[in-house]
């Protein structure tokens, strides 16, 4: 029956798109740096929508940085230390610059963009797409380790 076959194909296509979406090209990189230095967590947009320049970076537990056009939000503890410049974002570069690294900054960071989608009968809607995951490691330089040990002795 043609109707049953059509429904079956539709379901198969939906499952394939769900699986491909879940396995899409989300890369995980590792970045490391010493305490007090600056780390750049790489990120690049696949396409740039200059009408709604949006990027969000977060850890598993909190929003680190968010930009919507000129407006920005810096998460608690990250104030004055994080940025994705509007100019770079217009070029499709969404790398997070994290200054004055702290040991507590170590962890996995994820970047998200907003994508507009339009259905056949639905109005345009937006959904967030994961762009990248970055594992940040922060270490204490050997000379600072010696200074800490000497101070506690």
Residue ranges and their predicted role:
Residues 14-26, 58-63, 118, 126-152:
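Flexible inter-domain hinge/linker segments at boundaries of tandem extracellular adhesion modules
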Residues 10, 36, 62, 103-106, ...:
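Disulfide-stabilized cysteine-rich extracellular repeat microdomains
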Residues 34-38, 50:
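Short, surface-exposed loop/turn motifs at beta-strand boundaries within globular domains
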Residues 38-44, 81-135:
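Ligand-binding face of N-terminal immunoglobulin V-set domains in extracellular IgSF glycoproteins
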Residues 10-13, 17, 41, 92, ...:
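Secreted/extracellular small peptides and ectodomain modules produced from precursors
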Residues 27-34, 45-46, 150-152:
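Short beta-strand segments of immunoglobulin-like
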Residues 1-31:
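N-terminal Sec-dependent signal peptide, specifically the hydrophobic helical h-region
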